């Protein structure tokens, strides 16, 4: 799926996850 969508769901779905962590996981 789209990386931005992945980051969005990561940020709202996992407490304490930073944008950088989500971006790393999603790319």
Curated annotation (Swiss-Prot):
Organ and tissue specificity: Expressed by the venom duct.
Family the entry assigns: Belongs to the conotoxin R superfamily.
Protein name: Conotoxin flf14b
Gene Ontology terms: cellular component: extracellular region
MF GO annotations: toxin activity
Species of the source: Conus anabathrum floridanus
Secreted recorded as keyword: yes
The keyword Secreted is assigned to this record: yes
Keyword list, A-Z: Disulfide bond, Secreted, Toxin
Cystine residue pairs: 6-26, 10-22
Cellular compartments annotated: Secreted
């Amino acid at each position: 799926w789209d990386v931005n969508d992945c980051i969005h769901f990561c940020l709202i779905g996992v407490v304490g996850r930073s944008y950088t962590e989500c971006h790393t996981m999603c790319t």
